């Protein structure tokens, strides 16, 4: 259910784009993200940092899209978000000696430190490349195709990446983790 909740603004963007256009879809994505932030605050009393970051980026880039009537800003939004994730993953590990991926997953699985470092690096590289791929699609194909890619392409790539990571990490997961 959380997966659909997290994808709500993207799915809404896709639907509204197909029905009305890029500017209406951008406004819907901004509203949906603000609603998500408000809902999280009301129901749990706290808002996840990634959601806050996504909210700031969609308001800034989506707002620029609407204000300037230039769709290139909204096309940059996923790339900026992915690159913020990249910087966060690498910066936290290299500057603060804190592995964010480990922090998210260590309650579920136990692995040696070097494996956690490689996993963190793999995610950082994945987000970096996904950002470049988003720009490539945005500027070399139609907006229609970019919108399709934004939902289905990135979700598909994420799914394949997670499956690949799971297969690679499986040999490092202890028997206790499998219980």
From Swiss-Prot:
PANTHER family attached to this UniProt entry: INNER MEMBRANE-SPANNING PROTEIN YCIB, INTRACELLULAR SEPTATION PROTEIN A-RELATED
Its biological purpose: Plays a role in cell envelope biogenesis, maintenance of cell envelope integrity and membrane homeostasis.
Record GO cellular component, one term: plasma membrane
Subcellular location: Cell inner membrane
Protein source organism: Methylobacillus flagellatus (strain ATCC 51484 / DSM 6875 / VKM B-1610 / KT)
Protein name as annotated: Inner membrane-spanning protein YciB
Keywords associated with the record: Cell inner membrane, Cell membrane, Membrane, Transmembrane, Transmembrane helix
UniProt superkingdom: Bacteria
Family to which this protein belongs: Belongs to the YciB family.
Statement: the UniProt record of this protein carries the keyword NAD: no
Taxonomic lineage: Bacteria, Pseudomonadati, Pseudomonadota, Betaproteobacteria, Nitrosomonadales
